[in-house]
């Protein structure tokens, strides 16, 4: 079933919804970020991963500084319309530390 951006429940969590970013080919989970309506519209329009930075309080495109962009192949919405998956083709590491994925620390 297809959903429109207007059907996403941004109000449930104060205007933001979590975005799981997954490699479309390897299925690796690359990161977890957040999107608001504006950044989701930009992602849909441009085909690049756009998010809302909670720490900087601004829109940002993955790779705008590092060059490690993510080309969106598909956007999936969960059954409650309050979480999203970007299936992407990354051009480099997902993590700002240089690691391939952000989930590289094991909880002890």
Residue ranges: model-predicted function:
Residues 2-16, 22-30, 35-108:
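C-terminal binding/interaction regions
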């Amino acid at each position: 079933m297809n959903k429109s951006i207007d059907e996403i429940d941004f109000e449930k969590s104060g205007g933001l919804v979590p975005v799981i970013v997954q490699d479309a080919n390897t299925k690796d989970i690359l990161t977890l970020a957040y999107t608001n309506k504006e950044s989701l519209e930009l992602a849909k329009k441009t085909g690049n991963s756009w998010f809302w930075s909670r720490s900087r309080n601004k829109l940002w495109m993955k790779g705008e500084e590092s060059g490690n962009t993510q080309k969106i192949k598909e956007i999936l919405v969960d059954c409650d319309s309050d979480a999203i998956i970007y299936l992407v083709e990354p051009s480099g590491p997902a993590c700002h530390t240089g690691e391939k994925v952000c989930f590289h620390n094991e909880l002890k």
